[in-house]
């Protein structure tokens, strides 16, 4: 069921999203050679808790960390651990915070030091594809108007969108209806209504869109071992322009 948030609920959700966005920015600042993914996860946990919130991902369906940290060919759900970042890595950080009964959810891919031109292009196209989709976030449009815009932009740049995982509604639950694919024909799916909140999250691969899940049951990698990037914000549908609830200057 798709939930419509009232203004009182949105006040709490805006604060949850503000905390989430700040945690993403903090994680991004830590993406440097010599830093372990576990250290980034601890910083995310400490920050979220310091704000009176809870990490949305920690123990969610058994996930063992506060942030999903996915390096290079890992698309999503990377489990932080002892891996030490090195020059040239690209690092996707996905975070969520639960505050006053509501979740925020956002992600971005960061460059670790100097990266290849193609890796930077992948990051840039992934981010811009979100904003291409955002142009379709208007009252009365349909969910797959967003999907089609993202897919069209990504594929026109020679990359592929992941099919196996999609964006989603977000609110009192981390994952709510509707699903928001990053692919598909325009004009399909539920209509967008004011008060809906969506986590729009292009996951873009350098090569094939096929994925493989590792034995830990979480870590999802590209089937061909090529790079992947991720960009996500929580967005509110309004009567006019959409509102990015996890907005962060420069991200």
Enumerate the language-model features and the residues they cover:
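Active-site neighborhoods and metal-handling regions in enzymes and metal-associated proteins
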Residues: 1-251
């Amino acid at each position: 069921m798709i939930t419509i948030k009232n203004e009182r609920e949105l006040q709490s959700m805006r604060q949850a999203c503000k905390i989430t966005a700040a945690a993403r920015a903090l994680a991004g600042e830590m993406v440097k050679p010599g830093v372990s993914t576990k250290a980034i996860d601890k910083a995310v946990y400490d920050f979220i808790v310091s704000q009176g919130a809870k990490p949305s991902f920690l123990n969610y369906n058994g996930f063992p960390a506060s942030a999903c940290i996915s390096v290079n060919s890992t698309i999503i759900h990377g489990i932080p651990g002892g891996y030490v970042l090195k020059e040239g890595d690209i690092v996707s950080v996905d975070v969520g915070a639960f505050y006053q009964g509501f979740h925020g959810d956002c992600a971005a891919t960061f460059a670790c030091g100097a990266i290849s031109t193609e890796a930077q292009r992948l990051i840039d196209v992934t981010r811009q594809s979100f904003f291409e989709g955002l142009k379709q976030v208007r009252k009365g449009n349909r969910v797959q108007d967003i999907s089609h815009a993202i897919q069209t932009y990504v594929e026109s740049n020679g990359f592929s969108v992941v099919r196996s995982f999609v964006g989603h509604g977000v609110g009192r639950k981390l994952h709510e209806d509707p699903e928001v694919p990053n692919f598909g024909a325009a004009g399909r799916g539920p209509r967008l209504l004011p008060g809906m909140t969506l986590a729009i999250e292009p996951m873009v691969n350098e090569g094939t869109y096929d994925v493989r899940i590792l034995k830990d049951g979480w870590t999802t990698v590209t089937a061909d071992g090529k790079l992947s990037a991720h960009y996500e914000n929580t967005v509110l549908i309004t009567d006019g322009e959409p509102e990015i609830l996890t907005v962060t200057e420069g991200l």
